Structures are given as C-alpha cells and as structure tokens.
C-alpha cells in the first residue's frame, strides 16, 4: 500500500501497471487503495463486461474514453480525485496501448491497470507502452503480513523495530506461526481460509485450485509449441529444490534435456510471476551484477504454500519440527527467497566455485556491502562454506538464517528465520 501512495504523490506520475501472479490480490489492493486515498473509484473488469469490449476500438480519444468509463461505472470521474481501475486489461484489445495516451494527453487522471499474466506483455513491443507507464510488482503476502492476518501486530512491530531481546521471549510463538506459514504460504485466499477455519485440508483445497488455475493459464495463454515444456519445467521445481544444492538441472526436467530447449519455457514462467530465478555469481565483489552467470541458476516457486501442495508434502511435516531436516531445507530456502524477492530492490544471487564444494545459499547486495547468506532449516548451525568465505574475505560480514535466536558472533550474525525479511529491509536502508 505504501508503494501505491508514493505513486499517487509523484509529480511525474504515469499510468500504473500492477504486475503479479494470478491470485496474489492485485484487484483487492487496488480497490482498497482507491477507497482509502480517493473520493471515488471507477472500476471496470475488461474480462466480463460486454460494455467495455470495444472501448478503445474506434480511437484513443481520452475525452470519449473517460465519458464512456464514467457512464459504465456511474462515477463522476475527476482528475486527482478518482482512481480509474481497469482490471484484466490484457483481455481488452488495445487496452494496454491506451495508457500511452493517458500519459501524454491526460496525465492529470490517475489510472491503474492489473491483470493475470500482464508480465507476458513486457516483451510484446506492439502493445506495451514503453516509457509511458510506471510499474509495481505485487507478491504473495510476506510472513509479516501473515502475522497481521493472524492478529499479531505487536509481533510484527517487534520484528520491524529489531527488538531482538523481546522477540526472544516470544520465540515459541514466532516459530509456531512460521511453520504455519510454511504450510499456508502467502496467497491471500489460502491465508483467509486458514484464519477462518484453522483447517489444513481446506487450505490445501484452495492451493490446489490455484495450481489448477495456473495449469489452465499455461494451456490457454502460452505459445502452443511451448505448453508441454512449460509444464515440464513447472512440475520439476519440487524435485529441483529437493536436491542438496538446489541448482536447476535440465536433466531433472527430462533426460537429455538441453538449455536451448527450455529457455523460453523458463522465461514464460518468470514473466507470468510463477517462479523466482536466482543466478549464480562467481566473484564476491561489488557490484554483484557484473559477476552474474545466467547459465547457472536456481528456480524457486513464488509461494512456499504452493510448493507444499504441488509436492504433496503432508501438512504435519511442515507444522512439526524435524530432527534430520529432511524435506525442510527446500521449504526453508524457498521461504527465504520469497521474503528477499518481496524486497524488490534487493539484488539476490547465490555463489559457488567451480571444482569446489563451497557454495553459499544466497548472496545479497545491501547498499555498498556484499553479504553472504546461509540458510538453516532448524538449529544445526554448522556452516563450513560461510566460515571459509568469511576467512577468505576479512572485510565481509556474513548472515545466517536459522531457528536459533538472534546473536552476533564476530563477523557473523545469526538471525531467526522469522525475522529474515525485517532484518534485510533494515540492512539495505
């Protein structure tokens, strides 16, 4: 919501495209933003409203378009006082292209659009209004937002204030809710179902419905020649993450598979917002981006709850502590990745050396510092790779996320997993 308010108040504001996977709550957040920040909202759904089907077909005359939207919605549209929302805009012919004319001819009007798979238009030069729009990315609910949904605002406040002394006293409760988050994830409908019923089976039903909707999107919207390959990559992710080093291996998708056969499939999943890609760096030096190796990467699911549903992981396995970490490392690393990615301006990579066992789960660039990161599912804090990295780089400070309490150990900081996002957000400011 804060990002939307900042967009509203920008002097150079342009029409807004809100990107994000299906069912992360884009429509809800735009309507709520309009309710809080504007006198009224003119909302149209371009997918199920026959009246708007030909809205942009005659021309891009903004005066005519505004009169039509006002007539359809019954809203008196006023510059700066009305939020115009066009939902599922990808279903409306020439809908995205119209944003160029709102930007050039009527910048005083506040226009926001959303839709499923809008990210796929980023590479469509014919319809995407390059340079004429602002974009924001929306992600599944973070762990902190999950806590708020569970009516735990004080626990969120303690994490955001970095009050680790008080956080320690609530350790058992934080861990309980974190394990719940591993099961439920951050898809708003799944979170709401859990809050209302506390029933893991009903949550799984919601998650399976979301996964089915994604499958339908793949078959309906992906290029016909890529549908099978996209499905193969998508279904391979749980197996990819179950491997010890999580690196994406094409042979796991299909025996004998090659990169060139699946590059477009992976890009489609990225553009649809269904996966996160974390590339390898081969050197721990600023800026990390110039040391990026795009051919070596990890693929994570957008949501750990959906990962559990797709992998058929029993809910009890996620809700209870494990003694051997089996089946937990993948969820834990996926969780940390999703919390990092929700901080959209935080560069995230992983690090490994050729012909070496040394590998760091993540490497982040926070301001002018390179921070190596290790992730531990429980409280086994042995971390040979991180220890070696810090020994070889005496000016570097390392991070370890685990179930243990916050503590400083020389140039290594242990942060409890439930405080990972709060800590990283503070670190990059």
Roles of regions detected by a PLM:
Residues 85, 110-116, 137:
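Structural recognition of the conserved hydrophobic beta-strand(s) that form the central parallel beta-sheet
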Residues 122-242:
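Interdomain motor-coupling "hinge/lid" segment immediately C-terminal to the ATP-binding subdomain
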Residues 29, 33:
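Hydrophobic positions on the alpha1 helix immediately C-terminal to the Walker A/P-loop
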Residues 1-11:
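Pre-Walker A adenine-sensing motif
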Residues 48-80:
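Short glycine-rich substrate-engagement loop in P-loop NTPases that contacts/grips substrate
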Residues 195-359, 363-366:
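Accessory nucleic acid-recognition modules appended to NTPase machines
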Residues 26:
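Conserved lysine of the Walker
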Residues 340, 360-379, 398:
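Conserved catalytic cores of phosphodiester-cleaving nucleases, focusing on short active-site segments
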């Amino acid at each position: 919501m804060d990002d939307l308010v900042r967009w509203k108040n920008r002097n150079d504001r342009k029409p807004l495209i809100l990107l994000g996977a299906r069912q992360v709550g884009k429509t809800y957040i735009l309507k709520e933003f309009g309710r809080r920040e504007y006198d009224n909202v003119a909302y149209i759904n371009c997918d199920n409203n026959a009246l708007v089907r030909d809205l942009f077909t005659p021309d891009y005359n903004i005066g005519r378009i505004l009169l039509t939207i006002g007539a359809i919605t019954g809203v008196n549209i006023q510059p700066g006082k009305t939020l115009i929302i066009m939902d599922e805009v990808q279903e409306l012919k020439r809908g995205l292209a119209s944003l160029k004319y709102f930007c050039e001819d009527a910048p005083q009007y506040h226009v926001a659009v959303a839709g499923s798979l809008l990210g796929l238009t980023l590479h469509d030069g014919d319809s995407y209004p390059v340079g004429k729009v602002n974009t924001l990315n929306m992600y599944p609910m973070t762990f902190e937002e999950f806590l708020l949904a569970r009516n735990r605002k004080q626990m969120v406040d303690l994490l955001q204030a970095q009050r680790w002394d008080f956080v320690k006293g609530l350790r058992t409760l934080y861990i309980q809710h974190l394990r719940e988050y591993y099961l439920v994830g951050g898809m708003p409908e799944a979170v709401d179902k859990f809050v209302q019923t506390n029933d893991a089976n009903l949550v799984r039903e919601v998650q399976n419905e979301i996964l089915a909707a994604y499958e339908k999107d793949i078959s309906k919207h992906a290029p016909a020649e890529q549908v099978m390959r996209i499905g193969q990559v998508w279904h391979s992710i749980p197996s990819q993450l179950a491997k010890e080093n999580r690196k994406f291996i094409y042979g796991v998708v299909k025996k004998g598979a090659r990169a060139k056969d699946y590059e477009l499939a992976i890009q489609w999943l990225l553009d649809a917002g269904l996966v996160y890609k974390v590339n390898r760096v081969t050197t721990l030096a600023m800026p990390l981006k110039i040391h990026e190796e795009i051919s070596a990467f990890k693929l994570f699911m957008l949501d750990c709850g959906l990962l559990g549903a797709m992998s058929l992981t029993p809910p009890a396995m996620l809700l209870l502590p494990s003694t051997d970490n089996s089946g937990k490392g993948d969820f834990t690393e996926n969780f940390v990745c999703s919390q990092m990615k929700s901080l959209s301006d935080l560069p995230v990579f992983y690090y490994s050396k050729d012909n070496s066992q040394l590998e760091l789960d993540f490497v982040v660039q926070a301001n002018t510092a390179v921070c190596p990161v290790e992730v531990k599912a429980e409280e086994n804090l042995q971390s040979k790779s991180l220890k070696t990295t810090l020994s070889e780089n005496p000016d570097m400070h390392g991070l370890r996320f685990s179930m243990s309490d916050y503590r400083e150990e020389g140039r290594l900081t242990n942060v409890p997993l439930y405080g990972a996002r709060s800590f990283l957000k503070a670190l990059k400011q």
